[in-house]
Amino acid sequence: MRLAVVRHAESVENADKYNGFYQDPRPWTGAAAHALSRDVIGLTARGFRQTAWLGETLPQVVGDGPAVFVSQYRRARDTAELAMPGITAEVTGLLNEQHYADATYMTMRELFETFPDGADDRRHRKHLWTPPGKGGESLAVEVHGRVTAFLALLAPGAVEAGRSAVAFTHHTTILGLRAVLEQRPVTEVVEESRARKLPNAAVLVYRVAAGRYELEQVIEPPA
């Protein structure tokens, strides 16, 4: 049995985040910015091409009829639907991107000026930083807890039945998943990501045996 963890294909935010999404001052409320990120942001033309590549690649990894899970965000749902047509994915908030709450799409300058109390954590301990506002999540606590819950739910339905699974999710959520799946400190995974960020549409393939996950390979889309 294998678990394929997939970062969503390239979104319009990934391609052009500093030319429109991050404005100073931010033109939206925190709630509106979060809704924009969750419900509106779709894929670029390159992202659509990446989903075609995923459609060819994933069956070679997980075979036919895997269990498919996807976050509630549009860019992840679009990736799953285009990459695996004909398979109904289970949409789950457990795979959502880190919730940045009132900090969503704020520049660093505006963030530190508006919410100075959390500035040190954001600068030096980002994995511990809890974004201000309702629903704000830290990587080390809330995101880590969510992905742990996802894997606990996955175990009886797929792992124990020997059925492969695919999880379409997001950059920061994948950091949490890697920490749990590979039994590594969050700080180590974060530092590794700073050196080289996992590209959009990349696939982490884990072999599952006796309830343990072993990273088998990382497959990246064509440049």
Feature roles, as predicted:
Residues L3-A4, S11-E13, A45-D120, T187, ...:
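Phosphate-coordination/substrate-recognition cap region in phosphate-metabolizing enzymes
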